[in-house]
């Protein structure tokens, strides 16, 4: 463990994020933010609507009178814009691609990232998905420096997050953001006061890379031999992926979402993985019972 000592008056921070979150609001309320960059790589209809209407980062920047830049793809040159703002530290949360070295190495104090897992576990783009997949109930957040690798930089600090059985994705995400906001603020304060830890990560991760999951791969990932409790928990955490199985029409899938309801431990003769309906509603036949689901109108707060 090493301690790096810097003394910076009025630390200037630049934020890179694609989420209007507790993390963003905490930084805006407590630190000197000199710029916000919003990377927007996802071109799906629901994502565009969500970002443009429900989670408009540009409007937040305008409210706080902070310079804003939309980063439309990973090839866009953002270094000149960053140079003009001259931040001491860049803070990243929810970034769809890796930053170039010329960017993350520009600030005098470097660039830190908030990752929703206890590194070196679940390095990659979607750690929360894989937390559900591996039925991992003990997770957390990591604030780490960005280097050339994917989530491999030195760790500043970590905080634990407990996953409740059957907790939905958006509920767990809210937990991550609450604890993550505390963690990122603590990390910045430590860096600002010259008391930040830099803990080297192990080269190898105990888990496979937390890759993005496409429709076809999600279907392949479902292990119908899992017991009912595990598959129900997995479905509750991946409702947005389940719609690719349960809603065949692509346009309809943009309007509706899936909400997983209760599970029922019961014997049956249905084919495992098949869809049915009884007096209690629609259900998926699983090993050892049924998992009920409903169609709900799309809601960006439950995405």
Residue locations for each model-derived region?
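A conserved acidic, glycine/proline-rich C-terminal tail/linker
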Residues: 264-277
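One-carbon transfer enzymes
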Residues: 1-242, 246, 275-302
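Short leucine-rich amphipathic alpha-helical surface patches
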Residues: 235, 239, 259-264
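Short, structured protein-protein interaction patches enriched in aromatics and acidic/basic residues
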Residues: 247-261
